[in-house]
Amino acid sequence: MVQGNNSFRELPINSQFRLENSPQGNNQRFLRFPLNGKVNGLLPLADLRGVIQVALTEILPVPQVAEFLLGIMNWRGEAIWILDLACLLGATHWCRREGVRNSGMAMLVQVQNQTVGLLVEQVNTIEVYDPQERLAISASMLPARLGSFLQGYFVDSQGSPLMLLDTHVVIQALQPL
């Protein structure tokens, strides 16, 4: 007979993962991550293959590609592109930011059998939203470059906007490769 392990009782339970926050009806789950110091983004969990920590030394730079492409790395025997998501969206390149970190979190997305790592400084929580509550982005809200990579936005309980990333458009940015 296998003995039960009581150590799980000592772990704090994060309210983000309680059953009451599980998807109901048309609700969908999204991974929340910071786009910059003021704005957070959301990535649909349905598009996510995984999240891994990536040291910059694991990324092999590729010459003569777009600036937002940091290079390729090996993930489970597969060569995948790692791109600087903030740079793609118009922010300062990872290596030129103040307080640059030697590692980040890559959100692995797959569209049409192509896996790409979207490098961000950190990932936060899994959140649940009703797609019917998604708001459209007006042309005056954001620069056109940023807006083209977004499906819209949600508003969190504190009234802050959460930008919904369109992973299909992000992957299309790689199509010339």
What is each PLM-predicted segment?
Residues 1-177:
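An acidic, low-aromatic, low-complexity terminal/linker signal
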